[in-house]
UniProtKB/Swiss-Prot annotation:
Keywords: Amino-acid biosynthesis, Cytoplasm, Diaminopimelate biosynthesis, Lysine biosynthesis, NAD, NADP, Oxidoreductase
Name used for this protein in its record: 4-hydroxy-tetrahydrodipicolinate reductase
Organism name: Shewanella sp. (strain W3-18-1)
Binding-site residues, (S)-2,3,4,5-tetrahydrodipicolinate: H159, G168, T169
Entry annotated with the keyword Isomerase: no
GO molecular function: 4-hydroxy-tetrahydrodipicolinate reductase; NAD binding; NADP binding; oxidoreductase activity, acting on CH or CH2 groups, NAD or NADP as acceptor
EC code: 1.17.1.8
Primary subcellular site in the record, as a coarse category: cytoplasm
PANTHER family associated with the record: 4-HYDROXY-TETRAHYDRODIPICOLINATE REDUCTASE 1, CHLOROPLASTIC-RELATED, DIHYDRODIPICOLINATE REDUCTASE
High-level lineage: Bacteria, Pseudomonadati, Pseudomonadota, Gammaproteobacteria, Alteromonadales
Amino acid sequence: MGGQVRVAIVGAGGRMGRTLIEAAYHQEHILLGAAIERAGSSLVGIDAGELAGVGKLNVIIMDSLDYATDDFDVLIDFTAPDASIVHLDWCVRHKKAMVIGTTGFNQAQKIQINAFAEQTPVVMAPNMSVGVNLMWKLLELAAEVMGDYTDIEIIEGHHRHKKDAPSGTALKMGEVIAKTLGRDLEKCAVYGREGITGERDRETIGFATIRAGDLVGEHTAMFADIGERLEITHKASSRMTFANGAMRAARWVVEQKPGLYDMQQVLGLN
C-alpha cells in the first residue's frame, strides 16, 4: 500500500498498548489516528505519544471508539476476549478492518469472530512475530518427518501477569503438529502431569507452562526419541516484535476483502 494507514489502538495504556503506540510512531507507513482506554481510566486525556515515551503526537487518549470514528482505518486490539468481541462488533458496524492479537478466546467466541469476519476484513493470530510464524512452518516439517515415532512436548514461558495458559502460541503449535499428524488436539493434548501417570502414550502431545518474572515469551517444541531429540525454540526478548508484526498486518488487511485471515497469509507463508 502506497499511503499511510491510520490505526487506532485499544488498551493503549497497557504494556502492549504502549509498545504498539511506539511501533506506530517509528513506522513510515503507519499513522496513529486514535488511542483508546477504558472509561474511568486515569490515562484518559493524556497524549498517547508522551505516555509511550516517544514525545507528543497530538493524539489524546479517549475512552470510546465513538469519538474516533473518522480518525482511523484499522483497529488493533491486544486486550481481552470479551472486550475484543465488543470491539469487533463496533468495527463491523462502522466498516473498519481489525487486527486481533488477543488470546484466550473460547469456542463460542471464535464462532462469533468467524461470523463478524464475513462482514469486515480481520487478521487474527495468537502471535504476530515473524519468527514464530516461521516456526509453525518448521513444525509442520518436523512433524512430517519425526512425529510418528517421537514423544512430542511443548514448553512455554511468559511473565507473571499473563492470564491464560497454555499460551495461544503454544496451543497453535500443538494444532499445527496435530493437524500434520492427522490427530485431534482436543483428544491427544495432555496439560501438565501430576502423580502416578503411567507410561507415556506416544500419541499424546504434552504441554508444560511456566509463569515467572518478566519473560516476554519463550516456546519450545521437543521431538524426543531414544538417543536423540530435536528442539525448535523461539524466544522473544521484546514486545516490539509483536507490535511490528501487528503494524505489518494492519497495512495488509486494509487491502483485503471481508474474511478471517492469519499472519501466515500476511507473510505469504502458506
